[in-house]
């Protein structure tokens, strides 16, 4: 069947033209009943189109023609792969150029216009998120500042409340320590008051002092052993006071406890005499011989330099040795009879002084 007719027009086009002509003839015949109104073909076509079209579509068609009529587009549903590719590109750059958008459109099988609009929306979403984060940070800073300002005003009240129990604790602890010290000091004062009184009497009665020294000499060996066994920490005044066994023995034997103070005075006189003579000789090595039957009171086996032997430290060592003495040794020593006379006790004192001076690095007394 031949579709092309005269002058190259198809049969379909000819049929449409004939149909339009027939419509025009029918309209002309109907218009004869209304002599003042003669509608044109353009008016008829607009009247026909007004039934199914809006006024905006008619204006757009009048401006741009039927091809540029606004078409409604459905919302684009992005797949997971498309969104992943778009997000990766957005992390690299927020403003992709035309070449990057075209490549991304080819990879995601999307039109380039859709990619451009997606990036515009994504940038708007990113800015909105940044603004919300900034608001949250500002709010947190304000909260922190307010909490710091409140914390600066509140802690002094808490500190005052906390310092009250601390002071109570510190007062309670020294009170306990003071009670212990008072007990021990009372025992010491009871044990030392008698020696001081007796030393004053001994200055008047030196003969009784010498006889008392002869009686006390056998118990010195036990005292030296107790001094060796005592730890260095026990030399402190607080720890040295904790000697319950010594207080009872000291209270019972007053004549025995008076020996450290009297010997201390003798040693001080000896040191003053040696300082006056200025005969200080330092021995490089000192060999201790066999100890005599009556070693010098207060003599330590561990030799210390002369500079370290001060009066206070020596008095502390004597008082410590006085407290370390136990009651059985005191009772045993007090029960021993006095066998030596006054002359032997003086010679023994001189011998002990010579031994002590040699141990300290001092020259001996002139005979």
From Swiss-Prot:
Biased composition (Basic and acidic residues): 133-153, 203-218
Single GO MF annotation: RNA polymerase II transcription regulatory region sequence-specific DNA binding
Annotated region described as Disordered, given as residue ranges: 129-254
UniProt xrefs under SMART domains: HOX
GO BP: any one term: regulation of transcription by RNA polymerase II
UniProt xrefs under Pfam families: Homeodomain (PF00046), OAR (PF03826)
Comp. bias regions, Polar residues: 159-192, 233-254
Localisation per UniProt entry: Nucleus
CC terms in the record's Gene Ontology section: nucleus
Listed InterPro entries: DMBX_homeobox, HD, Homeobox_CS, Homeodomain-like_sf, OAR_dom
Top-level lineage group: Eukaryota
Keyword annotations: Developmental protein, DNA-binding, Homeobox, Nucleus, Repressor, Transcription, Transcription regulation
Tissue: In the embryo, expressed in the developing central nervous system and in other tissues including the developing digestive system. At 9.7 dpc, expression is restricted to the midbrain and pretectum.
Gene3D superfamilies xref list: Homeodomain-like (1.10.10.60)
PROSITE patterns (UniProt xref): HOMEOBOX_1 (PS00027), HOMEOBOX_2 (PS50071), OAR (PS50803)
Motif (OAR): 344-357
Primary localisation category: nucleus
DNA-binding region (UniProt annotation): 71-130
Family: Belongs to the paired homeobox family.
Subunit structure: Homodimer.
Function: Functions as a transcriptional repressor. Required for brain development.
Protein name: Diencephalon/mesencephalon homeobox protein 1
